[in-house]
């Protein structure tokens, strides 16, 4: 199970490696600056990803989406390659020009993404985001 999770993370990260948030202009293929909720990925999964890909993950986390947005505003998004956050915060980050457009030609599996999860309200033209996982509301 752990190996499957590590492979899933590896595939996901490689797909989204070029989704950089800011226009920092630096491209270091040996590192991935990830910013998401605390506890999103167990350390053993991150370690497995690094071991299998050779890509070092600089994992920063936040507790609240608003804290994440404040950090992106402070750095103009340039400190992170990949941010995983809630939809309404993604919409604000795009509106504030804190995210850069995707170069989908560099994402080899882009055409395999399920269209059901594409064209969301926060990115209707799929210019800035790719789906990471499906959220299903529960009652």
Task: Show where each model-derived region lies.
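Short hydrophobic/aromatic-enriched beta-strand-loop microsegments
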Residues: 21, 58-60, 101-104
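Phosphate-coordinating loops and pocket residues in cytosolic domains that bind phosphorylated ligands
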Residues: 95
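Glycine-rich, phosphate-binding/catalytic loops in enzymes
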Residues: 50-52, 99-102
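A structural signal for short loop-to-beta-strand junctions that line the ligand-binding cleft
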Residues: 78-87, 100-139
């Amino acid at each position: 199970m752990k190996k499957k999770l590590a492979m899933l993370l590896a595939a996901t990260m490689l797909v989204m490696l070029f989704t950089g948030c800011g226009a920092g202009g630096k491209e270091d293929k040996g590192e991935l600056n990830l910013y998401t909720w605390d506890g999103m990925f167990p350390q053993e999964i991150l370690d497995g990803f690094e071991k299998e890909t050779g890509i070092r993950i600089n994992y920063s986390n936040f507790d609240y989406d608003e804290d994440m947005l404040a950090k992106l505003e402070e750095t103009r998004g340039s400190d992170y390659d990949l941010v995983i956050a809630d939809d309404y915060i993604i919409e604000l980050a795009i509106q504030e020009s804190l995210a850069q457009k995707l170069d989908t030609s560099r994402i080899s599996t882009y055409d395999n993404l399920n269209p059901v999860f594409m064209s969301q309200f926060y990115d209707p033209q799929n210019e800035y985001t790719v789906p990471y996982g499906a959220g299903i509301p529960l009652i």
